[in-house]
Amino acid sequence: MLQVLQLIMNQIQDSRLMMLKVLGSSSKGNCYIIQNESEALILEAGIKFQDVKKALNWNIAKVKGCLVTHRHGDHSKYIKDLSGCFYTLALQDVFDYRGVTGNKLVPITPGSRYKCGNFKIIPFDAHHDVPCVGYLIDHPDMGTLMFLTDFYECDYRFSDLQHILIECNYSDKYLVEAINEGRTFARQRDRLLKSHLSLPGCLEFLNTSDLSKVKEIVLIHLSSENSNADEFVKAVEDDARKPTYVAYPGAEIDITRTYD
């Protein structure tokens, strides 16, 4: 009898296990899946739909929605394919730019509340070089997660977060090195300053945030030329005193809710 009860308890715990799966996190394409056994939420539409379906083990029926932050191709290129199957939340600017129509498109307003299955979602403005949002995402099995990519400044800070996905794109040290070696155009520096978050900017954002309940920090959208993953992780861990990871394609991170 005790063995049966333990088996049932284990099955319940497994069904509540919430995982973050990284499909892509760079200028080549961005996509993440938040999922447990019964529900999934897709973040970004920058990866081929076939690869998304494969990452879901072909169980697309459990997908409750897809969130897109902005119009750039590495985040929205495949929005037509995904929005043909799933409710897709994005700024109207994204739908207009991509020329997509359909009854599963949900134009969002920053600050408004949305729900996809048991996922509760609030978009908020982020400063990029095109209209852009971040998302607060809450689920009973996960707690609250902040997803903030492709920005150089954000006017908001949030409390009661358990999980943070935040851009940490470059540092001046590696950017200058890449420019001097001819791997990066000098003009790119001016664009980066007004479009993407540097390592110091990431540290400043975290230092001015309430991290008291944060379980982990995931660094996303690192530049292939202007960053150093190991160095960035160490800098954030030393400063924020939280376990820190880099969103490599194929990575899976446990983001199950914890209780103090």
Tell me the role of every PLM-derived stretch.
Residues 47-48, 71-74, 91-97, 110, ...:
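Short, polar loop motifs at secondary-structure junctions
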Residues 48-93:
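Active-site metal-binding motif and surrounding structural segment of the metallo-beta-lactamase
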Residues 71-77, 95-96, 129-131, 153-156, ...:
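Active-site environment of divalent metal-dependent phosphoester hydrolases
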Residues 89-142:
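Metallo-beta-lactamase
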Residues 158-250:
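Cap/insert and terminal regions of metallo-dependent hydrolase folds
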